[in-house]
Amino acid sequence: MKWVTFVSLLFLFSSAYSRGVLRRDTHKSEIAHRFNDLGEKHFKGLVLVAFSQYLQQCPFEDHVKLVNEVTEFAKKCAADESAENCDKSLHTLFGDKLCTVATLRATYGELADCCEKQEPERNECFLTHKDDHPNLPKLKPEPDAQCAAFQEDPDKFLGKYLYEVARRHPYFYGPELLFHAEEYKADFTECCPADDKLACLIPKLDALKERILLSSAKERLKCSSFQNFGERAVKAWSVARLSQKFPKADFAEVSKIVTDLTKVHKECCHGDLLECADDRADLAKYICEHQDSISGKLKACCDKPLLQKSHCIAEVKEDDLPSDLPALAADFAEDKEICKHYKDAKDVFLGTFLYEYSRRHPDYSVSLLLRIAKTYEATLEKCCAEADPPACYRTVFDQFTPLVEEPKSLVKKNCDLFEEVGEYDFQNALIVRYTKKAPQVSTPTLVEIGRTLGKVGSRCCKLPESERLPCSENHLALALNRLCVLHEKTPVSEKITKCCTDSLAERRPCFSALELDEGYVPKEFKAETFTFHADICTLPEDEKQIKKQSALAELVKHKPKATKEQLKTVLGNFSAFVAKCCGREDKEACFAEEGPKLVASSQLALA
């Protein structure tokens, strides 16, 4: 890289990082500004989502009352920005409103103490009380009742959907949830007039639920990354991903987008959903205005209405690689001035390396690209302190080979197993694997993580070879983050804490390297843990699987060194036992009679 080019790049990069592309005008009334920008419909939806994410146990009607009061106040401020209290910050206005809830102390306990604090400490306090695993009932589709409610009052029906999703996912990306609510509305608009509402709705709602869970997991990873690793780590993640998506965009352009995308997500993670949605709309506008220099895949997105446009941009496929990309070694391994460039502007130089490497490798996962950049940085730190730096860093690219081979080998091994046994048994293998790594973790969490990891096989193993690695490791990052988030609330394993907090890039290899926990004292065998009743026969298939998989995790906790064959025998016996008794006329009598025999034979098989 010629030095004059690097200087101009440094100027562009620094300018982009300090300014970004979003407007940052000051307004007399923040709430009036956001109300005018977003419009009443989106304003109300986002305030409802924000309040539901903070107070997850409050009834829907209570939240609607708060939202209506805030909306009326916003209208007053929009009409006269100098009206009383209109100059207060959104955190102050929303926090004051939340603190008026009469049942705050009784329902939320310590959260009520937040109301004694001043901003910004009060909002930070509210954030720490968000519950990633709230004790809320499972939502089940009831097509007839739901269609009646939808036709009677569509706005209330969609508001209830926003509320139910938001309180179960307290870090859900606010503006994206508005998009999913439109999908939800479209599903009911299509299916409610159908003769068989159930047959029409169920597949659509199941598919929407999967998209919701994925979207929630993606945003939770961003919010956790801000909290545990800081803004620099989030920006590095985004540089790698956007460089893969937009390989034709230059580094300064990618940097600008990363800066503002980071701002958008930081706002949403901090509960600032109105600013987040407003800034996201501005960023989508900027990207579409500059699409010619960013990506050839954006045109279809940019023709859509706002919510669909932003969603489409976020999900857009990687653009085609430019055909004239030069080899990287010349600039990053052979140039004699590398140490000078690195010392003069470390973040810019490393950012440039990450951008250049990532745009050439859509076949790598983001965390692999970050591990490569981390290795490159460590090599420069070492070599630039030596007598002959160029001789030292000349072979740096050779160090990347084992970093690439490790996840490729892991993906092949896991996909081979998935293709051999199918999703359910693949999940079982992962539940066993992770229970052995961290037997102290609660059984419901281990089963949830094992099932999620198992679904990665279905999602990724059928893809072409070039897409398997990024698909697998990017989705593994989401599942492992869920484990880390749940473990952070109730930490039980120092090894898990270390993997979760040491390094975002190294998190997956850290978990992969965990072995059987030799210091774990096995759980005592309790017959009631493996006692089942006739109600299992009428459960939906996924709930039946969870019951069996919970028993499997408990078996491993009882016998961590049980062999694969032993566990397979016991699980096979258990499945046969359930099938046998569910086929009997007097199911409960069968469970009562055969259950103790199963427990005894299981103990014997594991002895």
Curated annotation (Swiss-Prot):
Modified residues annotated as N6-methyllysine in this record: K557
Alphabetized GO MF terms: DNA binding; enterobactin binding; fatty acid binding; metal ion binding; pyridoxal phosphate binding; toxic substance binding
Post-translational modification: Phosphorylated by FAM20C in the extracellular medium.
Known role: Binds water, Ca(2+), Na(+), K(+), fatty acids, hormones, bilirubin and drugs. Its main function is the regulation of the colloidal osmotic pressure of blood. Major zinc transporter in plasma, typically binds about 80% of all plasma zinc. Major calcium and magnesium transporter in plasma, binds approximately 45% of circulating calcium and magnesium in plasma. Potentially has more than two calcium-binding sites and might additionally bind calcium in a non-specific manner.
SUBUNIT field: Interacts with FCGRT; this interaction regulates ALB homeostasis. Interacts with TASOR. In plasma, occurs in a covalently-linked complex with chromophore-bound alpha-1-microglobulin; this interaction does not prevent fatty acid binding to ALB.
GO CC, one annotated term: cytoplasm
PROSITE patterns documented for this protein: ALBUMIN_1, ALBUMIN_2
Protein name per Swiss-Prot or TrEMBL: Albumin
Residues binding Cu cation: H27
CDD domains per record: ALBUMIN
Residues of the signal peptide: 1-18
